[in-house]
Amino acid sequence: MSWVFVPFQLLSVALAWAVLVLFVEIVAAHFERKGAATREGARPRVVVLIPAHNESHGIVPTIGDIRSQLGSGDRLLVVADNCSDDTAEVALASGAEVIRRNDAQHRGKGFALDFGLRSLAADDPEIVIIIDADFRVEDGAIDTLARVCSATQRPIQGMYRMSAPPGAAVNHQIAEFAWRIKNDLRPRGLRALGLPCQLMGSGMAFPRCALASVNIASGHLTEDLELGLLLASAGQAPLFCPAAQVRSVFPLTAAAARSQRQRWEHGHLAILIRRLCPLMGRALAQRNRDLLALSLDAAVPPTVLLGLLTLVATLINGAGALLGAGAAAFLLGVATITMLVAALLLAWNARGRDLITASGIRAIGPYLATKAGIYARAFAADKKWVRTKRGRGQE
């Protein structure tokens, strides 16, 4: 009967590797060398590309932030993608160039970006910077992204911050802490190890030649994650530049926040299932260190799912040990849980003390229940892109 427990024993080994990757990244982040971004050399000419679907309510501040940072010869291009509102008119009145795309059969950010890039073929800018339509862009971010991208001739990912809206429930603060782990500590750890980072979706800069090497026309839920892996496979793995910061807030309503989390995490799981094994095989065959590092990083499931799977597998393997299936997998599970708790405590000490208080700890139970529902629906989910409603009344 011990064969019944073999899948859970193998799962424990895989989860141990995932937790080890997470632990190493978080520990390495504590040893990151502080230094200014590379800003020497001539400032290249850039085009800032904003894909926008029904974003008339939030795009004006974004355009204002970017226009104040543009230099001579730079361009700001908004792709009004399948819009049913006045996004195009608002963007044009705010000083951006605007092109319209209407194709109901091909919906999603990747298709919008591909349309925008093809419209730039005659211009051929040295650097293309992508900013989402609802993001604020910190002073100097465009200049820093442009110079670092030009100096390294690699795709660059800036610091992508998401914060809880004012007056939000405690579960938003827990979500913000998880975001800080994923998009701050972990890429800092990879940077400290001399490794690339994942693309996150906004605050990204690309040498024009890098984008020409991959097909970005996609409606997949996490096209940014997939694009980073494809670039790494082509020898153009992205680098992290925390000095260039963009920021936004989580959706205010519970339904919108749940929709956004579901979209991100279903997409991550889909990439994990569909792409990672072939990419890891390619990385080993090509001896591509950057692709292997990003594949291992992407193989780490969302933190809550990682914890739930590890706990369940350990309990089942504990039962197996009592029934004579051997104790090795159970002991490995206990060690993995210990390592995961240590990693989360280190992360909380570095990035969560201002967010997770006693009241936050009490809210973890309901938050886990919400996340469990997200994962339960993952395998039946629509993999097509769906825009998140940002606030009350927004479509």
Model-derived features: positions:
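N-terminal membrane-anchoring/stem segments of glycan-assembly enzymes
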Residues: 1-42, 344-346, 371
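Membrane-embedded multi-pass helical conduit in multi-pass membrane proteins
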Residues: 27-31, 38-40, 297-381
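Cell-envelope/extracellular polymer assembly enzymes that use nucleotide-activated donors
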Residues: 45-47, 75, 226
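Acidic helix N-cap motif at the loop->helix transition within catalytic regions
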Residues: 60-61, 85-93, 100, 140
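Short, acidic, metal-binding catalytic loop of nucleotide-sugar glycosyltransferases
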Residues: 64-73
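A conserved acidic beta->alpha catalytic loop
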Residues: 72, 80-88, 103-105, 135-136
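Long helical/loop segments within the catalytic core of UDP-sugar-dependent glycosyltransferases
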Residues: 100-102, 106-116, 120-125, 139-140, ...
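Short beta-strand-to-loop acidic/aromatic patch adjacent to the donor-nucleotide binding site
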Residues: 124-136
